[in-house]
Amino acid sequence: MIFLDSATRDRTGETGKNIESKKTINIDHHVSNPEYGDINCVIRYSSSTSEIIYNFIKYMEYKFSISVAEALYLGLVNDTGNFSHSNVKVGTMQMATNLISMGVNNNYIVTNFLNSNSYQTLKMMGEALKNFEFYPEKKLSYYYLDNETMKKYKAKKEDTEGIVEKILSYYEASVSLFLREEADGKIKGSMRSKYEIDVNEIASLFGGGGHYKAAGFSSNLSTNEILEIVLKNI
């Protein structure tokens, strides 16, 4: 079994829990990946798992189909924030150029996958922009979304994507924390940073992880307890 872009075995979901295989291959780029596979290809300086797969296909001299090229391009623009994150390097842009030369339509990918939102997504974003808090002494943007609000708009967790990045866009903020209450009462946390703050290290305090500037975690602590710990460690 091959696991892609899953920082921990828990992130592989029901498939990883319920299906057994003689060997597991772990292909990923997250800094916090503990290399849980029997075979591990964890390249932490890579912009995305898509870039790792792209380089493997090139090395093996396999032919790229247009559907494969499109999937790799989508993964690339998603994990680099449409080439806005610090993980973008020369090789990243060369990969994008090569995929576009194969026939990938950048405008179609960005318009239909990155810039296309549901009613619920826009409502969740509106709630975040209306209610987020800012802690100037730590330059932290913070927002908590309870399950009742999600039920009100019939929103799914996918409809909350982008909130943690949006509240980070406040010009005085250096780091953002987005907490979301799940149906079972657990708190799902997401963190982002602009500059020197290592949010992977902070997320690890709750058993989570990810990247230097983007990380996540789940916790049974209250939102106030989580916020207090985060503020102490920024």
Which sequence ranges carry the predicted segments?
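Short alpha-helices
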Residues: 27-95
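Short, well-ordered alpha-helical microsegments
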Residues: 10-12, 50, 199
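Short, hinge-like loop/turn segments at secondary-structure boundaries
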Residues: 20, 42-45, 194-195
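Residue-level marker of motif borders
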Residues: 23, 74, 202-204
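Active-site cofactor/cluster-binding pocket
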Residues: 1-39
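Hydrophobic helix-and-loop "lid/oligomerization" segment in the mid-to-C-terminal part
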Residues: 78-234
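Solvent-exposed alpha-helices and their adjacent loops that cap or buttress functional pockets
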Residues: 16-19, 33-34, 64-66, 75, ...
